[in-house]
Amino acid sequence: MIEKMKVVHIVAAASEKTALLDRLRALGIVHFGEKASADQRHLERFTELSKMEMLLQEYTGQEPEKKLLSDKEFEVFYKDLAACMDRHKALQEQKTAVHAAAERLSEWGAFSPAELRSLGDQGLDIHIYRTDKKTAAALAADPDVRVIRLAPVGKMPTLASIGPLPAPYPVTEFPIPEKGLEELNREWEDCDRGIRVCEAELHDAARHLPSIHDQMLKTQNAAEYSAVSNTSQSQDGLVWLTGYIPAAEVEGFKKAAAQAHWAWAMEDPAADDDKVPTKVKYNKVTRLMIPVFDILGVVPGYREYDISFWFLGFFTLFFAMIIGDAGYGCLFLLAALVMTLKNKKASTAVQLLWLLSIATIVWGALTGTWFGLEQAMDVPLLKSLVIPTFANYPAHFGVESTTQQNTIMKFCFILGTVQLSLACVMNIRRKLGEKDLSWLADLGWLAAIDALYFVVLYLVIGQQVNLMPVACVVIAGFLLVVLFGGMSPDKTFGQGLKAGLGDAFTVFLNTISAFGNIMSYIRLFAVGMASLAIAQSFNNMAFGFKGPLVIAAILILLIGHGLNIVMGLLSVVVHGVRLNLLEFSGQLGMEWAGIAYDPFKKRDKIKK
């Protein structure tokens, strides 16, 4: 359920601004929609602390500190660590540059640039060149040029001359470096020693990661406090703030306001207010969807539906059909059991894993799929659990494979039709309550979708359907959508009719899209069959190995089924989630563009 919100305006004396902010943060129920930027110093410090935390994660291993550093102690630690990180970074960059210079110089061998420069001071302007064999021969034959032949460098003739060579000759001069190879190697070793010293300090500093996390939390809280402070407005000795509070918290706010002597005003959000936050109230069942919504980062709009219950139901079924293997479900169940026993309590995510595991086992048992093994049907107990027309090995039940495939596809289309029809019914119910005449358009969509289901069966499965009444229902639904789709409580009948007729072509395209939406549920069948085929392929590969090669067979099974599980989980995200977020939500008119309710309070966890 999406909780109702109230807009609240809070006014206090400007001299009481700090007390106002402190009390509001302690109250922890007011959401501020458009906050100003936090103070730059807090943002910069949080960024630096985040960099420290990320770097020190690479140096963990020692037992973490048991007592957090005090703020004063942490400041000393912070400055030392920042200096160490800067020194470590500079040494790494220097080491990389020295290594690159040494690589470039290595083919020239060990020599002393200082000695070459000293010769220059004595009047010997030595230049070193590389060139091709033809040019080298020409230079040697030129009586006006004096060159000394050196050992080839990089398989190219190398020459030395007193003074620069004449311009016409195509040669590449070797610039005398500042440091020789020996000096560079010594510098590289010095950098390496310095880096090891820094890394020892970083290993020791990693013990204080809990203190860094604590300071990150404090800094984030300070940043939010400053943002709310900067958001407040003041004039004539007064300071005020505007935010949102859940309707269920109104009495608690009134009590706090009376104690603090605030002036306040409260009202319902305006119809065009798109900054109203969404607070979803979950029950014991729907809260299982929280991990999925958190991963996807989606929040329903304030005026949209809370579809957590329906999302959970369909998502569970889609997950089971896409994974499709009871053996994999048993592995998921085992993982859920291990995590529950390890933590001595099942988190919301683990509880969801329990549900998905059981659903996968049930679906796999009904289709007779156990690690893709056809031999599983030789076990009487497992065979007795199978619905013959759903069986992935229909020959064991005297069912033709075409009949089995058509049955599964038909089941997928039924799921799609039911889910999309449910969306229409939900829209009708809401609009009837709002006295919105456009509910008739949703009734038209309901009729059209249910009729299009038979068109899908006719085209995909080849089922005999009387198309005349189906076409009549689709046309009737289309007309209802065109005539009443533009209606709304703030329009006259004529205005709504005009708007609906103006969208007639769009409605025509949307009707075709509705047909495609039902068709898209065939992905549940296709992905499930692909997963089964992959499992069977790896099984056949593994069973072909005999004798000492059994170890290779085991590796093939582990890698193959592991890969299949990973691909199945990715398919759940790509296909199972899509059907809920696009097809179902699209029919509901949901955009998932809500703003999560995020009240101003002192946090005990770092906000991502």
Where are these regions (language model features)?
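Conserved, carboxylate-rich catalytic/transport cores that coordinate ions
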Residues: M1-K6, T18-F32, E251-K608
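Long, charged N-terminal accessory/stalk domains
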Residues: M1-W310, M339, A346-V350
